From Swiss-Prot:
PTM comment, free text: Binds 1 heme c group covalently per subunit.
Lineage, opening ranks: Eukaryota, Fungi, Dikarya, Ascomycota, Pezizomycotina
Gene: CYTC
Pfam families: Cytochrom_C (PF00034)
Gene3D superfamilies recorded: Cytochrome c-like domain
Protein name, per record: Cytochrome c
Keyword annotations: Electron transport, Heme, Iron, Metal-binding, Mitochondrion, Respiratory chain, Transport
Gene Ontology MF terms in the entry: electron transfer activity; heme binding; metal ion binding
Length: 108
């Protein structure tokens, strides 16, 4: 299974409760504990300027798309062993679809 369009309101709630502590969405908001997510889709792993990524993130070399995020967000440490992202993941497909749909809209 892969990504399918989700609920934006539920995605916003997930972002607020699970992601906003470490990530920003809008251009110019900058990095926090985690890298800024503005321009996320189409970007390569480990490529946000000014953020201190692990070598694992820099060397993964994939492009962030709906499908790569769908897999990554289920279990970040499994997808990129050595990442410093301290998030256990979203196990439910629906939650990942909701969050990715929201991120697609808000990070453009």
């Amino acid at each position: 299974m892969g990504f399918s369009a989700g609920d934006l309101k539920k995605g916003e709630k997930l972002f607020t409760t699970r992601c906003a502590q470490c990530h920003t969405l809008k251009e110019g908001e900058g990095n926090k504990v985690g890298p800024a997510l503005h321009g996320l889709f189409g970007r390569k792993t480990g490529s946000v300027e000014g953020y201190a990524y692990t070598d694992a993130n820099k060397q993964k070399g994939i492009e962030w798309t709906e499908d790569t995020l769908f897999t990554y967000l289920e279990n970040p440490k499994k997808y990129i062993p050595g990442t410093k992202m301290a998030f256990g993941g979203l196990k439910k497909d629906k939650d990942r679809n909701d969050l990715i749909s929201y991120l697609k809209k808000e990070t453009a």
